[in-house]
Amino acid sequence: MTGQLIQYGRHRQRRSYARINEVLELPNLIEIQTASYQWFLDEGLREMFQDISPIQDFTGNLVLEFIDYSLGEPKYPVDESKERDVTYAAPLRVKVRLINKETGEVKEQEVFMGDFPLMTDTGTFIINGAERVIVSQLVRSPSVYYSEKIDKNGKKGYTATVIPNRGAWLELETDAKDIVYVRIDRTRKIPVTVLLRALGFGSDQEIIDLLGEDEYLRNTLEKDNTDSAEKALLEIYERLRPGEPPTVENAKSLLDSRFFDPKRYDLANVGRYKVNKKLHIKNRLFNQRLAETLIDPETGEVIAEEGSIIDRRTLDRILPYLENNVGFRTVRMSGGVVEEDEVRLQSVKIYAPDDQDGEHVIRVIGNGLVEKEIKHITPADIIASINYFFNLLHSVGGTDDIDHLGNRRLRSVGELLQNQFRIGLSRMERVVRERMSIQDPNSITPQALINIRPVIASIKEFFGSSQLSQFMDQTNPLAELTHKRRLSALGPGGLTRERAGFEVRDVHYSHYGRMCPIETPEGPNIGLINSLSTYAKVNEFGFMETPYRRVDPETGKVTAQIDYLTADEEDNYVVAQANMKLAEDGSFIDENIIARFRGENIVVSRDRVDYMDVSPKQVVSAATSCIPFLENDDSNRALMGANMQRQAVPLLVPEAPIVGTGMEHVSAKDSGAAIVSKHRGIVERVTAKEIWVRRLEEVDGKEIKGDLDKYRLQKFIRSNQGTSYNQRPIVKEGDVVEKREILADGPSMEKGEMALGRNVLVGFMTWEGYNYEDAIILSERLVKDDVYTSIHIEEYESEARDTKLGPEEITRDIPNVGEDALRNLDERGIIRVGAEVKDGDILVGKVTPKGVTELTAEERLLHAIFGEKAREVRDTSLRAPHGGDGIVLDVKIFNREDGDELPPGVNQLVRVYIVQKRKIHEGDKMAGRHGNKGVISRILPEEDMPYLPDGTPIDIMLNPLGVPSRMNIGQVLELHLGMAARRLGLHVASPVFDGASEEDVWATLEEAGMARDGKTILYDGRTGEPFDNRVSVGIMYMIKLAHMVDDKLHARSTGPYSLVTQQPLGGKAQFGGQRFGEMEVWALEAYGAAYTLQEILTVKSDDVVGRVKTYEAIVKGENVPEPGVPESFKVLIKELQSLGMDVKMLSSTEEEIEMKELDDEDEQASDKLNLNIDSTESNV
């Protein structure tokens, strides 16, 4: 027997074919959401209040300080928030202190700052009753970027950009004449020396002393027309503010506010970290030849000789000195923007590598590690970045790849919320300042100063309408999990679909272990929306990290030490794959190892390996790692497989796959659809609706019983996508459960494992051409036994509002409706629970007053006294739409009088839930896990299906031609292994990239007593004759997708028309018609089908009178009359007349036809037909 038995949860054992032992447990898969939000509550909010505090008025007399904040208890729990359509939020209270410096008076107050949306335990938010997810955003990290450019003459140049988190960009570039220019905030370019002068290096000599002798610098100085700090400041001011009179003071304050004011310019923690990393001298001396001897200024000791080359060892040795005090110098500045008159830099002279003689000395200037707390750019940063640019021109340093994950970072929920909160607070700050100067300083209170509206508005706007706040995909637990782990490059501050090029979307070597190379949507968003890999984490700076096992450099053995590396850090190491053979003691067995280094696959000797992968599945995402035999599938098909699993509809009877990957249990547990125990305990009570667990706590080495936890189960709730959300207990009374153990299955789960589809008997064979083009033939057994039956719940609501003519009323008393239509309504006029409804049936009876005139005072009085039903009402009842038949599951009624929160003008709201049981049907879409999708073309009687030698009819026939060209061979291996496992009564796990090999599959087939090739003779169910060749038959896991024919089928005879053009609307939602477009008209013209053409352009479209006459003629059995003039023709004439053109219509005898005559004809016809043209089913 190959493989070993592994327990997944309490109820499932699988035979696993994995050869590599798991050294690291999978992290909590929704940690990216929960940890980020927790950071926001603990630190993010505090940072914001510290940034804004204190707020002073313009005189400096009043000071408002934010001291502390606290979150209260939410008004409603999660379930009730959903039911009541409110936001699940807690009140945020802030302690504020107001100091009056004149009188010395101090006032403290607690101010309510609005309700703040809370994250549920499962990583979602409930906004206005709907469950939403905040998707993490992939953006370019703030930093200094250097890139190469080739101009139109083929000359190589460079550009540099300093990108902050917010604030002005600073760009450097070279031109054809080897002059270095700078652009401030995308304005016109100026020589870089102008900026240096403005910083306080007025003369040419000072600039040369600062940066060293250089031909590029000489060229730039020649181009520069300024010769002092003042002139340079004026020059920059003219570029930034053209047309304004320049003064030195204005120029100083402008530049100061652009770059050196923390409120206007922010690099953020990550920007400061990246800038220091890029510009610090230690990272730039590697492999360079020193042109001076480095001496420790404190001891006088020689650290490195002139002429020595700094290799990795030397660099490690001199690193402590470089970080401490070697090479530092202080440079004086005068008359510049910055108030300080000196700047501290670190510089070392080296020989330029591009010089043939090797004698050209250049300077490497570092920014001297600016403190982490300084979030704006400093003169040292500007000088060091300019120096790096000059060094690049001499081949020192390197350019950056902006698609490398070291230069792209994630903004998760916490940070996105913080940015939004900052916008609200800064708007509030402005209001506070204004109020301080208007109101009387002695009687003022903090409460009166603070206006919380802008804060609440910005938070509401973010959750309600941001591109990154999305309606959660709740089709099944996997869709839920994937949505929470999604990474989007779109959104505010990100890319746009139209502008994103090929490079950004492409797979990059730094994605390894951080972002899934497979799971991404097909279509315009490909590569812009990605998924986090299974083991990846996000560090404090927002960079994705992936775990590796450390290799001990002394012994060469793989240790148990796990290090999480960012893409930048990984570039310094040689990493071995997870499938390298190891001895018992952790040393590599093979002499030469296949490893990765900076995107190259290389063969190295084993002593050069620094790290080793943790697991083969660390490359892919949660959804992709649920595909068995992924290694045998083409990546394009694997992409479809991963995406289609997210569209699987939860079935009536879920069944976990016989051939799984071992990820089913973890995905199900972390998705948020299952109920997971919060503590270790003993189960005391289990019902369909709740589970009680008594905590077991350890005190002095003994276990004692603690508090009781009550877990409520969701029963047949409507999910966001209209599928049924139902939880079922899987523990019994008396069970001892561990912390984070599954207590109840959610939708699409069985025994604690993800169960998206069913294991069915599949044969690869054709049958009468019915599986042409990937179509699927099913056995009727799957319909009869409810194998692919799913439950769908639709919600309909009707509200009774106040209208100008009086309030609407929900009632059973509806005009012109027979008793038969009301048979299922209760006395209030609302359908009873359990009633069967067909489309068009009344769900909620409602009447709306349609008074033509306002009532006089006397009539109103009579109406009030006698309650006469004299007033005219019309029927506006809620009816079941087309395709909406089913059984009433639940009815919810909300009344303003009962204290329910309803929108303004609404007195009563009724929600009706209708449940449908949908069996599998021709036209439904099905798929396997390998991207093998198809539409059901025929459902055959069981007796006509081909059958096995033992008489078992097969369930599904797939076209064998769907396999070779698509190159998803994984499905064939799954088929064979599934059959063997079913025979052996096993469930198996074949983890991705470490699953069952071909040999394992054949061995398992033999173990099950089957033929080694997995094929069998099949007999035709109609004749009983055997088919000519043996056929591959086995168990495959097939899922039913959310694209069901019931949702797509649509037909219209008459229906609503557009108001202006009077043409039928389009689309199923509007009950529209099929568009007969320009090309279809050409087809009829080509055939010369004149009458058909005329009819389609008039009575079937927008000839208002004509279509009514035609309808009448058809009803009476008369001939169809002549068509009239289409409405769109009249609209066209009116449009041309509105342009001032005189448009006339001529008859065939060239007499003018007046539009008025046509209108009169219409009116006469309408009078005769007794119809009101204006309201002919004209719904917009």
UniProtKB/Swiss-Prot annotation:
CDD domains for the chain: RNA_pol_B_RPB2 (cd00653)
Alphabetical GO biological process terms: DNA-templated transcription
Signal peptide positions on this chain: none
Pfam families to which the protein is assigned, alphabetical: RNA_pol_Rpb2_1, RNA_pol_Rpb2_2, RNA_pol_Rpb2_3, RNA_pol_Rpb2_45, RNA_pol_Rpb2_6, RNA_pol_Rpb2_7
Keyword Lyase among UniProt keywords: no
InterPro entries registered for this protein in UniProt: DNA-dir_RNA_pol_bsu_external_1, DNA-dir_RNA_pol_su2, DNA-dir_RNAP_su2_dom, DNA-dir_RNAP_su2_hyb_sf, RNA_pol_bsu_bac, RNA_pol_bsu_CS, RNA_pol_bsu_protrusion, RNA_pol_Rpb2_2
Annotated region described as Disordered, given as residue ranges: 1154-1180
Single GO MF annotation: ribonucleoside binding
Catalytic reaction list: RNA(n) + a ribonucleoside 5'-triphosphate = RNA(n+1) + diphosphate
Keyword Thylakoid annotated: no
EC number, UniProt record: 2.7.7.6
Polar residues compositional bias, start-end: 1167-1180
Gene Ontology CC terms: DNA-directed RNA polymerase complex
SUPFAM superfamilies attached to this UniProt entry: beta and beta-prime subunits of DNA dependent RNA-polymerase
Gene3D superfamilies tied to this protein: 2.40.50.100, 2.40.50.150, 3.90.1100.10, DNA-directed RNA polymerase, subunit 2, domain 6, RNA polymerase alpha subunit dimerisation domain, RNA polymerase Rpb2, domain 2
Amino acid composition bias (Acidic residues), ranges on this chain: 1154-1164
Origin superkingdom: Bacteria
Keywords linked to the UniProt accession: DNA-directed RNA polymerase, Nucleotidyltransferase, Transcription, Transferase
Family membership noted in the UniProt record: Belongs to the RNA polymerase beta chain family.
Subunit structure of this chain's protein: The RNAP catalytic core consists of 2 alpha, 1 beta, 1 beta' and 1 omega subunit. When a sigma factor is associated with the core the holoenzyme is formed, which can initiate transcription.
HAMAP family attached to this UniProt entry: RNApol_bact_RpoB (MF_01321)
Cited function: DNA-dependent RNA polymerase catalyzes the transcription of DNA into RNA using the four ribonucleoside triphosphates as substrates.
PANTHER family listed in its UniProt record: DNA-DIRECTED RNA POLYMERASE I SUBUNIT 2
Name of protein: DNA-directed RNA polymerase subunit beta
Organism whose genome encodes this protein: Halalkalibacterium halodurans (strain ATCC BAA-125 / DSM 18197 / FERM 7344 / JCM 9153 / C-125) (Bacillus halodurans)
